Amino acid sequence: MPNSTLFFITLCLSRVLVTFFFWMAGIYGVFHFAEIVQEMVTVGLPWPVLFAAGTIFCQLAGSALIVFNPAGYGWIGSGMLIVFTLLTIPLGHAFWAFSEPRRTEVFHIALEHITVVGGLIMSALFAGYRR
């Protein structure tokens, strides 16, 4: 790995960018908790308040672990967000349950989630990088 200031700055910036959506969603959830609970009700999850709190915790704690990478444990945050993101596909973006043209629209959202997972895998791999 190159040991340069530019590489380190780029790595830090990439950690912020790969978690940006999760930060925004988590912060939004803190201030609009009832809406997040209603989302859990809509997808049919039991204990919607617990799942809403868990969702917000996962988004914020996972993001913080990636960005701050304490003692090289950012990979745990990556793993949290990978599992969370993959679970949102069958729970919130089940494209196979729709007919066209909605099926294609939701399928594209699922593909975007897969792409985010790829970025999170890279963040897990770089979690051990030390300047």
Model feature map: region roles:
Residues 1-32, 49-61, 68-131:
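Extended, low-polarity transmembrane helix blocks
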Residues 15, 34-47:
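Short juxtamembrane and helix-loop transition motifs at transmembrane-helix boundaries
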